[in-house]
Amino acid sequence: MINGRYQKEDVVNNNNNLNLNLIEKTLNDLTIKNNTNINNNNTNNKNTNYYNNNNFNNNNNNNNNNNNNNNNINNNNNNNKYLNNSHNNNNNNNNNNNNNNNNNNNNNNNEINNNNNNVLSHSSLSGKGGSTTYETTSYTTSITSSRDTGTISTSYESSSSSSSSSSSSLYDDDEYSDYSDSSDSIDSYVNHRQALSKSQQQQHLQQQQDQPQPLHSSMGAISNEKPPSPTNQQQQQQHHHPKHNIELPKTSSFGLQPNSSIPHKKSRSDFDFIRTIGKGAYGKVKLVIEKETQLIFASKILNKKLIIKEKKAKYVNTEKTILDSLDNPNIVKLFYTFQDENNLYFILEYCPNGDLLGALKKAGCFSIDVVRFYAAEILIALEYLHGKGIAHRDLKPENILLGKNQHLKLSDFGSAKQLSIGSHHKGSRSGSFCGTAEYVCPELLTEKSAGVEADIWSYGCLLYQLVSGKLPFKGFNEYQTFLLITKREFSYPDNFDKCCMNLIDQLLDLDPYKRPTISEIKNHEFFSSIQDWSSIPSQTPPPIEQMVPQSPFPSPNSSLRLKKRSLSVGSPINSSLTYLSQPPIKPLNLDNSNIDYNDFENNQIISNNNNNNNNTTTTTTTTTTSANTSGSTNNTLYFTSPNVTSPPTSMSSNNTPRYINPLPTQSTTTTTTKPAYSSTPSSTILKSTPPPPILSSCSSNNLLGKSSNQQYQPFQFHQQQQQQQQQQQRERSSTTTPSPTFLSNHHNQHQKNLQQSFSSIDKSSFSTSSPMSSPRILLKPTELVLMDKDRKRNIREQQQIDQYQWSRFLLPNDEIILACGITEKRSGLITKKRQLIITDTPRIFYVDPVKMTQKGEITVDGSLSAQQKSSKHFIINSKGRSRHFYDLDGQSKLWVDLINELNMLSFK
């Protein structure tokens, strides 16, 4: 043997001995086992790749070398892809006639261990669901010939490929495909590839015959030396050779085409995108039609760049994995997943009737029968999820869809978490914060962890909302909502179902381990009418009828619940003030449809001051003013002008004043008559100082943000008007239900009074000057620290008068404004005016002074800092984000010093 080649000249005269040695050596090197056949096939199909479930056959049959005493070796130079560990090797009737040595090696059904890198093949395949892992190592024999040297060289090639496809990586191209290892699809592929025509086979044989044959010499024979094993470098090169990279077909489990035996992976081109039917934070949902089947689906499209930027890849993969493992009639189905350069696509079951929130808004609230049925369907879906150890963690009406038969489908598993199976009450818990503020469980706010018990809490909130049409926990902002949740502060409407109320009380337990399990909820009295839970998905849902929502009103002792700040209820000046807890509700059926109850609600508080005016009016509120200390009273009714920082610069087209802010100067007794549709007694006597009402709305040219020290001149009505009003008050006191006609007359007359009274105001008092001096540093944090409680309370009460237009954005009875001023906030190329407010809580937020809505809040923590860039420009940094503000008066240094001082006292 020279340079790894077998020389024919070495074995001319010793054929018998060499063949015997070869047989003995071969038997020693090969470990023979049962149930495997390796056959060397003389057919040289160079361009055919077979997927064979059972055998990889290479047959050497009846190779008779009569003239040159050599074995004519034929090789399969194919990239054969095979799946099982069964190989056949038949060396039949290899006759060497010249030397009369017949060596028959019939190794049928033998498995050969490749300990010496012989002609072996090993493959392993494992896979389940959407994850497939496979390894393949193969060695093939190749023949090279040289006409010049007359030598035959046998070499061995090895290939090894390992691949793993899983849904855990966002950057894998096939990550959003559901993989199927179905043997049926593989058999179909094999049958398709093996269905070659005879002419094609003959063409392959003809090509084989046309190839140059190796030279044979009478002196040549095969050496008994073992063929050389490939070196490590050769193995490494062969391992990365393209023809050895074996890949199984990857396709969705739903991706098999009905008219094709080859699995097809779906892509965007397979669907027609019709229209957008929903939008979310990271993408949108479109109605799509599959071109081949004309089936309708909903495609959830997620933007890749946005997901990576927001670090939400983990949640997207979790949603895909969880949806792929679920199969329940009350859970939306996932059919295909794929991606392109920019987006990820979830092809989901289409629910044509929208979500539960839309149905709830149309109906107002649901009847008990509808609530019971849909609550049962939601419970079935939760039971299925919790049985698999999955917590949804974002249960709300927006994530519950209505199918074509009005049955519920739970969707949106982006916040879902895979926990241990049977984790209720003692299993694993997740510490990540997710969900919606109004439905979040208290343990996630306090303990920073939650399990499947979080779904039970959200289920209780959802049940409350379906019955009443309102949320149980709803504050002015998320912070206030969280306080309501942690204190479990909510109330029920008057006509709330008692049985359902008992169930909700158990569901909304602050202790997560005291909340009932799914089975305990099923056995509750509220679901006693359901005998067969398994028949719920096949039942016809009860019809949804429009109803009047049972609005829950804030409890009187609530200091955190959002209270509507309007002229009808006023704003508290001190802790002794008692105010109406129930804002008026519009009646359903009134004779006069032209009544504007918004204006009626916002313009019915009348205060007192003395001035004569010849006007007539009728009102629903009278004020009795103490005239002297002897206790005698003089019944008069007055309007007073608001004590505002600046007056409005324009009025509406009909000269109707929109803002009247009475300034209380004396102790009064106010009698308020509630409308007929209120549940409280018709006559409620409130003995207190009337509060200054809060502006309910404003226009672009209103009194907000204007500076003026002038006040409106007070005016009063004639004595005859006062007597008429007193007579009307006595009439209203004697009846409990004012008629619609009375309400209409009151509204119309009241509007006339406002027009006449406002026309008497001196127009010179209106100012069109520039916005108020900014910033208005009202109080420094260091000064506030040294104050006692009484002093703080007095400041708070005074601010509710001086800064009343901004007090609606404060936490009730808790916050003191440290600074308040008009600024310009710049975001990119856009600059908008914003009222910047800093409080002692501490809180920093900014308000749109025109729309009177809070536009944003800056987190106050240890990362807070402020920088002065110029006399007007300053930056507030928090949580890695910078917000640019511009002080119009060039006093940016005051803002910076105040913010840094506040941060130092709070967190240093």
UniProtKB/Swiss-Prot annotation:
Catalytic activity reported: L-seryl-[protein] + ATP = O-phospho-L-seryl-[protein] + ADP + H(+); L-threonyl-[protein] + ATP = O-phospho-L-threonyl-[protein] + ADP + H(+)
Ranges of Low complexity composition bias in the record: 53-170, 179-189, 200-216, 607-684, 710-741
Positions with a binding annotation for ATP: 281-283, 300, 349-351, 355, 398, 412
Skewed-composition ranges (Polar residues): 250-262, 696-709
Species: Dictyostelium discoideum (Social amoeba)
GO molecular function, one term: ATP binding
The Protein kinase domain, residue ranges: 271-527
Domain remark in the UniProt entry: The PIF-pocket is a small lobe in the catalytic domain required by the enzyme for the binding to the hydrophobic motif of its substrates. It is an allosteric regulatory site that can accommodate small compounds acting as allosteric inhibitors.
Protein name: 3-phosphoinositide-dependent protein kinase B
Claim: Nucleotide-binding is one of the keywords in the record: yes
